[in-house]
């Protein structure tokens, strides 16, 4: 019996193939032939879903971002106070990255090889993380109006700082030590959330 594969499954396999190929050869050296070989599909199937390998990489980046956002959101919703939310969110984020090191290295580093479009989707992803951070801070402000709200610029600075620590761990092949970032990342965000309006 011939296996019936849905269009969603084909797309998922192609993105998995992209992730595996880039992890093995780097984005610049990856070809569409590499992607379809690892995805076990034809080139025709590839072009039915993506116009180019760049489009495939950008789709992979966006899908992985969606998954990370959902993991963090679930961690936040499972916590009962602000301290727990902050710690659980950082832990979930770092554990997800540690569990998928090759994919995350592709996304953190290789996305830059996609040029201006890569920067655009990376910036959009960082904005989504910053928005989630601000929403978490807004919950605290609702409960404690004297607490200072997180501005858009401050949220982006926090996201950028934490991601830079992650990038350093990746570049120095210390992904196994990634959870050590949890403490400074949590301390940074808690310090920001602890500020009161009177301190401005």
Regions found by a protein language model. Name each.
Residues 1-9, 141-148, 197-200:
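N-terminal intrinsically disordered/low-complexity leader segments
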Residues 7-18, 35, 60-68:
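Generic hydrophobic, amphipathic alpha-helix propensity
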Residues 13, 21-55, 59:
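Helix-turn-helix
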Residues 16, 83-98, 156, 160, ...:
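Amphipathic alpha-helical segments that line or abut small-molecule/effector binding pockets
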Residues 59, 74-102, 147:
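Hydrophobic alpha-helical connector segments
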Residues 96, 135, 152-176, 188-200:
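Amphipathic C-terminal alpha-helical segment
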Residues 98-117, 134-137, 167:
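Amphipathic alpha-helical segments used for helix-helix packing
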Residues 116-141, 149-164, 180-183, 187:
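Amphipathic alpha-helical packing segments from all-alpha helical-bundle domains
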């Amino acid at each position: 019996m011939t296996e019936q594969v849905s269009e969603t499954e084909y797309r998922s396999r192609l993105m998995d193939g992209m992730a595996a190929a880039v992890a093995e050869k780097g984005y610049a050296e990856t070809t569409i032939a590499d992607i379809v070989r690892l995805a076990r599909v034809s080139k025709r199937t590839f072009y039915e879903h993506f116009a180019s390998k760049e489009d495939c990489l950008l789709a992979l980046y966006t899908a992985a971002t969606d998954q990370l956002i959902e993991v963090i959101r679930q961690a936040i919703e499972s916590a009962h106070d602000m301290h727990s939310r902050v710690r659980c969110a950082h832990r979930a984020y770092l554990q997800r990255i540690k569990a998928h090191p090759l994919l995350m290295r592709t996304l953190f580093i290789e996305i830059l090889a996609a040029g201006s479009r890569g920067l655009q989707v990376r910036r959009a992803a960082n904005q989504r993380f910053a928005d989630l951070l601000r929403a978490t801070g807004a919950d605290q402000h609702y409960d404690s109006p004297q607490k200072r709200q997180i501005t858009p610029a401050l949220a982006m600075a926090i996201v950028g700082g934490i991601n830079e620590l992650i990038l350093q761990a990746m570049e120095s092949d210390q992904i196994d030590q990634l959870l050590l970032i949890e403490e400074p990342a949590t301390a940074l965000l808690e310090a920001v959330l602890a500020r009161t309006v009177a301190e401005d």
